[in-house]
């Protein structure tokens, strides 16, 4: 019997993703001037209004209100008719300084403690060349390509910034080998008066061939386009958006576990972010080293303590070695204190706004996607096995 698995994504113009991008743009602006900035920036967007809040300790001097407007403008919210645009929206800022009780246990060199307690997961598998699950990878491609069509071409000129996608993949009986794309759902905001038939035809004839491999598309594909029949009211005028509400979209689309912590607006002293990136780095290198076909890595931390309180590796029975031995290899090859993670993955570089739409993982420009440990893991595997 076939096995189906579904994941969703949302575009850069989705309200929650607007909030994520603003929060990360504020983080980037502080890191660009002060690498030691401590930032926890939260954003709310609603009809005609942006609210900024959170805690920041930094020597940087930035203008968060202008940063918010620039992000909104770059996404494409420039038309006042849709009731949310960069020039006319209100922006309220209530950012304030971080608690000294937290900073005394977090700041400081090699013994830098974790910014909070918590558990973080990383995942990798062989379904795509990015070593990511196929449903979330294809979902990201759909909304990313929609944004490209909207911003860079004259095709589908009726598109507005807000959109969502959902992809169901049919797998073979092993539940790991993709067979075909079973169902695609695309909901995209559009101008008034555009026939839904036209939008459906354009999604089928323009979007799908650009975004998805045609060898996985067949005549049995189930395609839903704007299933409600209309999507004119969207963006923050249609739904309020808040930082950190798309944590499954940000990660693996429901494959693997999630520790619950969001990423955007947080500097890398917050292990919610940095340790999740490190866990992905570990998992991807294990799979790329052909030590397993699937890897889920859990890291856990205590606030103010540098070393993780636990490390776990699960391969779902696909490992060439027992999971306990792979876990020992991880301990041997990867330093997982906050300071070591920050140094190895170059996490003080202001690149975070780029992560805030279309997924934090499976994108080769990010250092946590680099295969830096593959050869060392391969060399060490026979020694562990013996």
Swiss-Prot record:
Residues 98-108 are annotated as: Flexible loop. The keyword Electron transport does not apply. ATP binds at residues 14, 162-164, 230-231, 239, 245-246, 262, 266. Its EC number is 2.5.1.6. L-methionine binds at residues 55, 98, 239, 270. NCBIfam families: metK. It holds the Pfam family S-AdoMet_synt_N. This is S-adenosylmethionine synthase. It catalyses: L-methionine + ATP + H2O = S-adenosyl-L-methionine + phosphate + diphosphate. GO terms for biological process: one-carbon metabolic process; S-adenosylmethionine biosynthetic process. Binds 2 divalent ions per subunit. PANTHER family: S-ADENOSYLMETHIONINE SYNTHETASE. GO terms for cellular component: cytoplasm.
């Amino acid at each position: 019997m076939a096995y189906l698995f579904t994941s969703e994504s949302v575009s850069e113009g989705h309200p929650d993703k607007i909030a994520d991008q603003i929060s990360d743009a504020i983080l980037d602006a502080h890191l660009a001037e002060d690498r030691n900035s401590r930032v926890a920036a939260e954003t709310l967007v609603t009809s005609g209004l942006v609210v900024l809040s959170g805690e920041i300790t930094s020597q940087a001097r930035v203008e968060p209100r202008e940063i918010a407007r620039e992000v909104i403008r770059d996404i494409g919210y420039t038309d006042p008719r849709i009731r949310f645009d960069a020039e006319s929206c209100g922006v309220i800022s209530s950012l304030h300084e971080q608690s000294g009780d937290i900073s005394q246990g977090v700041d400081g060199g090699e013994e830098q403690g974790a910014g909070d307690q918590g558990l973080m997961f990383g995942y990798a598998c062989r379904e795509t060349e990015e070593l990511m699950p196929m449903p979330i990878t294809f979902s990201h491609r759909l909304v990313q390509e929609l944004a490209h069509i909207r911003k860079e071409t004259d095709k589908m000129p009726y598109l507005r910034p807000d959109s969502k996608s959902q992809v169901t993949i049919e797998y073979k009986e092993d539940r790991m080998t993709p067979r075909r794309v079973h169902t695609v759902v695309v909901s995209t905001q559009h101008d008034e008066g555009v026939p839904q038939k036209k939008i459906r035809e354009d999604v089928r004839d323009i979007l799908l061939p650009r975004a998805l491999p045609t060898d996985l598309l067949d005549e049995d594909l189930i395609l839903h386009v704007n299933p409600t029949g209309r999507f004119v009211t969207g963006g923050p005028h249609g739904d309020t958006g808040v930082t950190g509400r798309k944590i499954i979209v940000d990660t693996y689309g429901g494959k693997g576990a999630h520790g619950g912590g969001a990423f955007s607006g947080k500097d890398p002293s917050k292990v919610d972010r940095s340790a999740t990136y490190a866990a992905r780095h570990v998992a991807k290198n294990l799979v790329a080293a052909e030590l397993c076909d699937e890897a889920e890595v859990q890291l856990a931390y205590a606030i103010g303590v540098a070393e993780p309180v636990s490390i776990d590796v699960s391969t779902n029975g696909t490992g060439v070695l027992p999971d306990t031995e792979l876990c020992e290899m991880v301990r041997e090859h990867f330093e997982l204190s906050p300071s070591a993670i920050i140094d190895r993955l170059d996490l003080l570089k202001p690149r975070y706004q780029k992560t805030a739409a279309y997924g934090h993982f499976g994108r080769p420009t990010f250092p946590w996607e680099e295969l830096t440990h593959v050869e060392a893991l391969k060399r060490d595997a026979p020694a562990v096995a013996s």
